[in-house]
């Protein structure tokens, strides 16, 4: 599980998309697609590629899902025993999940929705976040991440070394009719706050 599903299971239900839920499942296996098509589920499984990152296992954790409360427990080793009412899941960490979400802006996730999700990410792990940004293959996702990070004064933001992140070249249209953010060369809502420039590290 990853993306928006991982964030919801981690407690970000208040930002869930209304209507029938999608399960963001990351796999490049043809067999996985065949199995999912045969399942009868109360949510729509949506299969996505794991090729967004150079390290397919980077930031993926084994965590217990409480089947009663539908909440995730802390990350654990894959061989750990879980209570009988728990199901062990391979799920994206918050750091990986938010980049998976940003890669789908504005295709399946709106800019404002992504901004709301980012507001709650107060405790990201700087080392893992930096590694994921360096491994991420989506220039758009990385630029959006750094743009949103510039809106907040979270402690982990100061540890991100922008000079080690490949942000590509050229402009990216994210919001049609928006203004161009000069720091990251992406279009953002005209009424939004400008990103606060930071000295390169």
Q: Could you tell me what each predicted segment is?
A:
Residues 2-7:
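Leucine-rich, amphipathic alpha-helical/linker segments
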């Amino acid at each position: 599980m990853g993306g928006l599903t991982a964030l919801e299971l981690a407690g970000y239900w208040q930002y869930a998309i209304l209507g029938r839920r999608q399960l963001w499942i990351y796999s490049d296996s043809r067999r996985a697609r065949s199995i999912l098509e045969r399942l009868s589920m109360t949510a729509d499984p949506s299969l996505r590629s794991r090729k967004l990152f150079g390290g397919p296992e980077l930031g993926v954790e084994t965590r217990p899902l409480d089947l009663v409360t539908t909440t995730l427990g802390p990350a654990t080793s894959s061989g750990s025993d879980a209570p009988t009412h728990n199901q062990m899941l391979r799920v994206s960490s918050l750091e990986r999940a938010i980049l998976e979400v940003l890669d789908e802006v504005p295709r399946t996730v709106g800019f404002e929705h992504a901004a709301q999700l980012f507001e709650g990410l107060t405790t990201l792990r700087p080392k893992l976040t930096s590694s994921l940004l360096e491994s991420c293959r989506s220039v758009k996702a990385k630029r959006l991440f750094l743009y949103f990070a510039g809106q907040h004064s979270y402690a982990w933001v100061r540890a991100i070394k922008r000079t080690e992140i490949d942000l590509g070249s050229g402009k990216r249209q994210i919001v049609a009719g928006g203004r161009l953010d000069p720091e990251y060369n992406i279009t953002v809502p005209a009424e939004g706050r400008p990103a606060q420039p930071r000295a390169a590290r």
